[in-house]
UniProtKB/Swiss-Prot annotation:
Keyword rRNA processing: no
Keywords noted in UniProt: DNA recombination, DNA-binding, Plasmid, Transposable element, Transposition
Residues annotated to bind DNA: 20-39
Gene3D superfamilies: Homeodomain-like, Ribonuclease H-like superfamily/Ribonuclease H
Protein name (database record): Transposase for insertion sequence element IS21
An annotated Gene Ontology molecular function: DNA binding
Family: Belongs to the transposase IS21/IS408/IS1162 family.
Domain HTH IS21-type: 5-66
C-alpha cells in the first residue's frame, strides 16, 4: 500500500497533466496501482499487518544496507530483486518505515536519477565588478541529475523572465530536454507550496508545456532535495568567481562562464563515479528529449496605446509605429537584450532597440510617410490669384 504522501502526489501529478506511466515511474509502483489510487476520493486506510513471508529471507541484508545509511527503498528493492525477491515495493517500504527514526537527521541519501530524467534549477548571487562598477551578479545553475553536467546563466535579475531564459539556454546548450525539472519555491516558478500541494506560476507551466517536461517543487524547508545543483552554486562561488572578479558586461560574464565550464567544470572528476561530467553526458545525451522547433519566448509583455502622432512610450522614451495604428492598442514584447517588438493583432508591425530618453525619440521614417504626404498636399495657387485680392 502506498503512503498518504504518494496518494496526494499521484492526484497532483495527474491534475497537472502527467501521464500514468510517468506517475508510476516517479512513485515507484505499477500503472495499475496508479489507476486504482486515482479512483479513491481519499487515501485508503493502511492495513495493520503485512505478510512478510517473501521478505523474511532478505531482512538481514536490508538491515545491513540501512546500517550503511542506504535508505532509498528503490535502491534496496532493485538489489534484493536481483537476489531473488519476488514481493512488491510496498512490503519493503512497510518494513523500512518504522526504522527510519534510526536514521541520523542530518544525513541525506543521494538519489541517483536515470539519464534525461531530471534537471535541477537554482539561483546564486555574488558581488563582482561589471563595467567598472561593483554590482550583484545573479547566476542561474541548471544541473542534469545523471551526468552532473551543468549550464550557468548570469543576469541582472532573478525574475521570471530571466529564470525561463536560463532554462531555454540550458536546454539549447545540452541539445535536448529532460522529463522533470526540480525547482526551489521561487515565485518565478511556484506561487504556493502547502504540504506538497503546489500551485505553479502560469508562465512556468507554459514553459513546461513548450518543452514537454513535468515541473516539480522541493518541499518547503527541504532544500537538500536538490543538493546536486546547490553544490554547483557553491562550486561556482569558490572556483569561477574566485578566479574571475572583473567583467566588461553581463555578456562577458556569460562568455567567461561558458569557457570555464568547457575547460574546468566539465573535466572535473566525480569521485563517486570515477568519471567526468563530460564522460557521463556522452551517455545521457542520446536519451534527452528533442528540442521544439522554436525557443520559448521569454520577453517581457505589455500593452500600449498608440498616440495620435503615431508613437508609443516605453521606459521614458518614445518609439514610432505605423500611422495606420494611431489611437489603437498594441502589444509589446521586450527581449532580455533590449529589443522592442510591437504587435497589432499578433502581427509584428515595428521593432526598435531600447534607448534612454537622452537619445531622443526613435523614428522609422516609413512609419510617418503617409502623415507627411497629407501635410504636403496643400492647394497650389498662381500668384495672380493673390494679386486680385489686393
Amino acid at each position: 500500500m502506498l503512503s498518504r504522501e504518494d496518494f496526494y502526489m499521484i492526484k497532483q501529478m495527474r491534475q497537472q497533466g502527467a501521464y500514468i506511466v510517468d506517475i508510476a515511474t516517479q512513485i515507484g509502483c505499477s500503472e495499475r496501482t496508479v489507476r486504482r489510487y486515482l479512483k479513491y476520493p481519499e487515501p485508503p486506510a493502511r492495513k495493520t499487518r503485512h505478510k512478510m513471508v517473501k521478505l523474511k529471507p532478505f531482512m538481514d541484508y536490508i538491515d545491513m544496507r540501512l546500517a550503511e545509511n542506504v535508505w532509498n527503498s528503490e535502491v534496496i528493492f532493485a538489489e534484493i530483486k536481483a537476489m531473488g525477491y519476488t514481493g512488491g515495493r510496498s512490503m519493503l517500504r512497510y518494513y523500512i518505515q518504522p526504522k527510519r527514526k534510526m536514521r541520523p537527521s542530518k544525513r541525506t541519501v543521494r538519489f541517483e536519477t536515470q539519464p534525461r530524467y531530471q534537471l535541477q534549477h537554482d539561483w546564486g548571487e555574488v558581488e563582482v565588478e561589471v563595467a567598472g562598477q561593483r554590482c550583484k551578479v545573479n547566476f542561474a545553475v541548471n544541473t542534469l541529475g545523471f551526468s552532473r553536467r551543468f549550464h550557468v546563466f548570469a543576469a541582472p535579475k532573478q525574475d521570471a523572465e530571466h529564470t525561463y531564459e536560463s532554462l531555454v539556454r540550458a536546454f539549447r546548450y545540452f541539445g535536448g530536454c529532460v522529463k522533470t525539472v526540480l525547482v526551489d519555491n521561487q515565485k518565478a516558478a511556484v506561487l504556493k507550496n502547502n504540504n506538497g500541494k503546489v500551485v505553479f506560476n502560469s508562465g512556468f507551466l507554459l514553459l513546461a508545456d513548450h518543452y514537454n517536461f513535468l515541473p516539480r517543487a522541493c518541499r518547503p524547508r527541504r532544500a537538500r532535495t536538490k543538493g546536486k545543483v546547490e553544490r554547483m552554486v557553491k562550486y561556482l562561488k569558490e572556483n569561477f568567481f574566485v578566479r574571475y572578479r572583473r567583467f566588461d558586461s553581463f555578456t562577458h560574464v556569460n562568455q567567461q562562464l561558458e569557457q570555464w565550464i568547457a575547460d574546468v567544470a566539465d573535466k572535473r572528476e566525480l569521485r563517486q563515479f570515477k568519471e567526468t561530467p563530460e564522460q557521463r553526458f556522452a551517455l545521457e545525451q542520446e536519451h534527452l528529449q528533442p528540442l521544439p522547433d522554436t525557443d520559448f519566448d521569454t520577453s517581457y509583455f505589455d500593452i500600449r496605446h498608440v498616440s495620435w502622432d503615431s508613437y508609443i512610450e516605453v521606459g521614458g522614451n518614445r518609439y514610432s509605429v505605423p500611422e495606420a495604428l494611431c489611437g489603437q492598442p498594441v502589444s509589446i514584447r521586450i527581449s532580455l537584450d533590449d529589443e522592442l517588438r510591437i504587435y497589432s493583432n499578433e502581427k509584428l508591425v515595428a521593432s526598435h532597440r531600447l534607448c534612454s530618453a537622452s537619445s531622443g525619440w526613435q523614428t522609422v521614417p516609413e512609419h510617418h510617410a503617409p502623415l507627411w504626404q497629407q501635410v504636403s498636399q496643400v492647394e497650389h495657387r498662381p500668384l495672380s490669384a493673390y494679386e486680385e485680392l489686393l
